[in-house]
Amino acid sequence: SYCNHFSKGEEYVKNVLNELKVSYIRQYCIKTDERYYNIDFYLPDYGLAIEYNGEQHYKFSQYFHKTEENFIKQRQRDSEVRDLLYAKGIKLHIISYRTSFEKVKIDLEKLLK
């Protein structure tokens, strides 16, 4: 199923976190009264969430969204996740699909030292 599909970017982040020997929860679930949100990585020791955002988080994709309305919902969800994490005192580090893997690694090393 799609829920068990991880992008190359997410796999790379996982490998870097493992390399840095950082404990994390993958696909961490945050629940509100209305719905559930899955966060790509939650690092409890750091009070940090990491989201690897693919292209579909930034622009409409027929493949991912099917309709413009679904793209708008995607953007709303991203905003709700930011607000929810902020309210819980969890920092959010967003990695864009446009970021080179080399830079992803450097950024994570800085963030987690």
Regions found by a protein language model. Name each.
Residues 1-113:
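Nucleic-acid endo/exonuclease domains
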